[in-house]
Amino acid sequence: MMQELKQSYIKTFDKDDVALSTNDLSVLYGGKVQKLFDASLQFKKNTITALIGASGSGKSTFLRSLNRMNDKVATVNGEIWFHGLDVNKPNINVYELRKSIGMVFQRPNPFPKSIRENIVYALKANGKTDKQELDKIVEESLRAAALWDEVKDKLDKSALALSGGQQQRLCIARALAVQPQILLLDEPASALDPVSTSKLEDTLKQLRSKYTMVMVTHNMQQASRISDYTAFFHLGHVIEYNSTAEIFTNPKGKITEDYIQGSFG
């Protein structure tokens, strides 16, 4: 098994092209159960990177560590580099960090408020009160999430009345409202029907020109359709990281090939 866990290939980029990177990132739960081992990855600006692997492979643990979502439940060792700072240091303000590195979760989680209030809630909490400015951000965020045309006449209606797919795009709009540079997505389409999934994928592809995105997915077809790069995780290790085209058509490692072909996982 140790032979299988050797890395096959880990792609790197020119320093100026990197939006976010990790160095020897490891995660332990309860101080003794290690779920991630020495993960070192670079994420290229304005691309979508898919994290794939079987359940329990460490991909979601890795993703949630990137903006310190695991702080209260796990010990995270190693480095996370963003704008020249190791943001895994204890002196980092994690709330400010999460404005720059946003998160969209597996299931839509709109606030039990109006569509408008879902977008402006965090902005108001951070001192923005000008109605004209807030209205502008609401429209821009909903347009970016490809939701504006569907909800522009019912912004004061409950967000809970939206369909599942609309709710997930609202959650993306809510994350975009605070102007992040990076968007983390943990299986964002897993609870959606095929039509809603297609709309969500189109939205993510449009956002790529402005944001860097890292997405966990169990859907191999989805990874191949919308991602530029793919990282394959297995038993807490990053086994292979390359362009999505290479991962799916010419994987370097046998274990990667087996997973892509559905031989395990």
From Swiss-Prot:
The keyword Cytoplasm does not apply. GO terms for biological process: phosphate ion transmembrane transport. It comes from Lactobacillus acidophilus (strain ATCC 700396 / NCK56 / N2 / NCFM). GO terms for cellular component: plasma membrane. Residues 20-260 form the ABC transporter domain. It is found in: Cell membrane. Keywords: ATP-binding, Cell membrane, Membrane, Nucleotide-binding, Phosphate transport, Translocase, Transport. This is Phosphate import ATP-binding protein PstB 1. Its main location: membrane. It is an enzyme of class 7 (translocase). Part of the ABC transporter complex PstSACB involved in phosphate import. Responsible for energy coupling to the transport system. Its EC number is 7.3.2.1. One of its GO terms (molecular function) is ATPase-coupled phosphate ion transmembrane transporter activity. Belongs to the ABC transporter superfamily. Phosphate importer (TC 3.A.1.7) family. It catalyses: phosphate(out) + ATP + H2O = ADP + 2 phosphate(in) + H(+). ATP binds at residues 53-60. It is a peripheral membrane protein. The complex is composed of two ATP-binding proteins (PstB), two transmembrane proteins (PstC and PstA) and a solute-binding protein (PstS). It holds the Pfam family ABC_tran.
